[in-house]
Amino acid sequence: MNQHYRDTRKIDPTKGALLPDGTPNDNDRVEIGPTQLAFREWENAGLVMPNLERMREYRWTRLTQHIVDRDLGGLLMFDPLNIRYATDSTNMQLWNTHNPFRAVLLCADGYMVMWDYKNSPFLSEFNPLVREQRSGASMFYFSNGDKVQQAASTFTAEVEDLMRTHGGNKRIAVDKIMVAGLKALEARGFEVHEGEEVTEKARAVKGPDEILAMRAACQSCEDAMHVMEAYARAEIPKGGISEDDVWAVLHAENIKRGGEWIETRLLASGPRTNPWFQECGPRICQNNEILAFDTDLVGPYGICCDISRTWWIGDAKPRQDMIDAMKHSVEHIQTNMEMLKPGVTINELSANTHVLHDKYQAQKYGCLMHGVGLCDEWPLVAYPDKHVAGAFDYPLEPGMTLCVEALVGEVGGDFSIKLEDQVLITQDGFENLTAYPFDPALMGEG
């Protein structure tokens, strides 16, 4: 049987010129995205696909409006996730977090310019909203040595020229910039404003296609979790399986679906779950003990799925104190979730939180909720004893997405329970985007 070139050049030969998300069905395209496995699973789950062209335009429009609303001439971004939000393009994302070679300037008139690695200007050409591709934004010592100031002067001269044409003033917001870059902007007479305030608030309210993309990413994350759970339950009782072995499954399954990375190493077993935040390591998991994790997973479309589960692995029943802690954790996140609706303020969420038992207070989580999108995002909802007056005086809005947290463990104990669900604020309440079940044995049902 002949295989035609028109089929071999497609990512999915069964589809037409476009994939279900509206992107080119071109096997050799530059743009990254979900794999056929992800699309099949989403179709089987009955999910509606996002349209990425609309999603990109929504983000660009929203960022531009936030610039105009603040009477800024432009927004200069170095954070790779802000660049992803503005352009939907990627380039060595983790390397870029500590070597800021990329920059994007979005001007008040919507004109957007990307400075990329000199050998890869093509990585954002798929998005027509990026009007120019340049290079030369690197202002870090590894790249420029003792000529950092010279590099900063050259780069900021380009920014000044663009702002003169497209900005209308010299008020510029900047998210994260090297010291030499900040000094060079100020030397050119720019009035520098806090860029993260702009980007975080713009990113906080998701558009319709972003919400569809998040549903898809959450489905892929949970599909990967199911594979990891099956592996853990089958292999740990046999012996010789490390925490790293289990965690590697989630990484692999994420990548198989077109996901991108995992932000943390928060998987621990047995006594290493208390205190929480011990990183996944070489410990050999034991039969009849707890395994807890927090996904912090950046999946398809660069969307973060940040959920936590705690499993009981073994053939015996968990202790009653473990069951009690698990039920208390579920009560905590479900009760707090019921407060969520448009108009409720961050301060009200803090003040009215479900109160953990005294024995769990010392080791409770760092927040009771936080925003989520491309990663953990604004806002943060603090517990009352960590609440800072004036830090988050804002109401919830439809389209915001939050993660609702619980960490329950006693000081000096031999286990912790970690739970977390991802939630969408709707027009009249909330929708829990997380379908993954709680462990029945720890719920006392096994």
Q: Residue locations for each model-derived region?
A:
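Active-site neighborhoods and metal-handling regions in enzymes and metal-associated proteins
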Residues: 1-446
